[in-house]
Amino acid sequence: MAIYTKLNHQNIQLLANDYDLKIIEFSPLDGGSGNSSYLLKDEVNSYVLTVCDDKRLEEVTKLGQLLLLLKSYNVPCNRLIKTVNGEILTTYTISKSIKPVILKYFIEGQVVKKLNESMLIQVGRKVAQLNKIPSPDYLPKNHPYGRHFFSKALGLAIDNRYESWLSEEIVYLDNKIIPNLPCGLIHGDLFYDNLLFKQSLNKPISFKAIIDFEEACNYYLVFELGMAIVGCCSNDITIDLKKARAFVHGYQQVRKLKDIEKESLQLFVHYAAVATSYWRFNKYNIEEPRKDMIGHHWQMVELSKEVFKISTTRFFDAIFNSD
């Protein structure tokens, strides 16, 4: 990932002064799109300092507020550090641009691309814990790359076949998503690389944390499950229904799904794949064009089609019915 804002030791220490820290070592981290992150170390702890290149102060303040809220509910996630003045963020000014900066404790853990069923049960429990937290008023009511934004990709003549397909998906989803589905606080981007695990000597691997809450919103709770199944239970071609079953099983140990959510889950797995295709198309063809990623959205198009092909009875039985 690109480092948008390049900081030297002097820059780092000036920012660290706002937290009364003396930094002895730092290095850039691979970060999410739209921000620049650095691993900092002092004599005691390790930290992650993030310069939010593409977000406004208001957005980052809300993210900080959310992280503080999650801490109060003991959700295993990034722990925000306030400045010595009690502020959620500080700022870095470059070329007359003021960029928000946040500091979090570094979480030691590993990303696992291929999650097994035991790991997915653990993830399901923690995601359900998150989804039971009352959603704060400051979170958006639409998902940042949900269907309400799909029309932004239409009429651009960048990929006519994709744009035509997406226009049909907008109509399909608008007609199929039923009213009165439960909404609440969701992470919104539960792919495997937003989960950390801990491997201890002579012990099974255990869940450590959920990270990167930039897409958090007050949205359909079943969308959270759909995205997690796409992001953690697929093999790039289709969904592994045994893994999806394990995730949902763990989830329901903490939060029981309503019947309308169970009946809508397959639709929302499909929806999550469509939404991810839109994110990739928008990211790599419009916002940050990359020749090597220009067709990356098609993988999610094909996944969404494979989910659609599964009979509703087979999908429901595989996820919810006892053997």
Outline where the language-model segments fall.
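ATP/Mg2+ or Mg2+-diphosphate-binding catalytic cores
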Residues: 276-323
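ATP-binding pocket architecture of kinase catalytic cores
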Residues: 42-137
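A cross-family kinase active-site recognition segment
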Residues: 113-162, 183
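Active-site acidic catalytic loop and adjacent metal/ATP-binding pocket
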Residues: 35-41, 48-49, 80, 171-223
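Short Pro/Gly-enriched beta-strand edge/turn motifs at strand-loop
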Residues: 17-24, 168-179
